[in-house]
């Protein structure tokens, strides 16, 4: 939302924008101590809470299909395990030269959805 906007989500967009800016700022400030700072951004993630929310909507299967149709990679929600795998990568030595980054673990939702809409 901080990168794309969607309407009626000003507070959420502001919080996401702050996360993005602070990630970059803290990466610069903590660089001299050898501390890397990165953030993870997710879109729709299938969790028990999300499942409960969607199951309390009228036509839950239809709503889930509508949401998942907007996720370009495999038309499905991200799993908690996929997010955890991304975090494990950022915490590992495999990302030893990565700092100040916002990593989107969202099946291409933020950066590909709008581009593919016209394809």
Ranges and model annotations:
Residues 4, 88, 99-119:
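Short C-terminal tail/terminal secondary-structure segment
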Residues 25, 52-56, 101:
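Residue-level signal for well-ordered alpha-helical positions
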Residues 31, 36, 98-100:
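Short, small/polar-rich loop/turn modules that mediate ligand/substrate recognition or access, typified
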Residues 32, 45-71, 114-119:
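A glycine/serine/threonine-rich, flexible loop-to-helix segment
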């Amino acid at each position: 939302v901080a990168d794309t906007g969607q309407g009626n989500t000003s507070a959420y967009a502001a919080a996401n924008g702050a996360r993005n800016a602070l990630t970059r700022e803290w990466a610069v400030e903590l660089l001299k101590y050898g501390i890397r700072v990165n953030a993870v951004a997710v879109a729709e993630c299938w969790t028990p809470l999300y499942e409960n929310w969607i199951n309390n909507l009228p036509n839950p299967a239809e709503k889930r299909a509508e949401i998942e149709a907007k996720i370009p990679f495999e038309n499905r929600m991200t799993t908690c395990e996929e997010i955890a795998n991304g975090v494990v990568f950022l915490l590992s030595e495999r990302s030893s030269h990565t700092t100040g980054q916002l990593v989107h673990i969202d099946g291409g939702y933020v950066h590909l959805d709008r581009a593919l809409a016209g394809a």
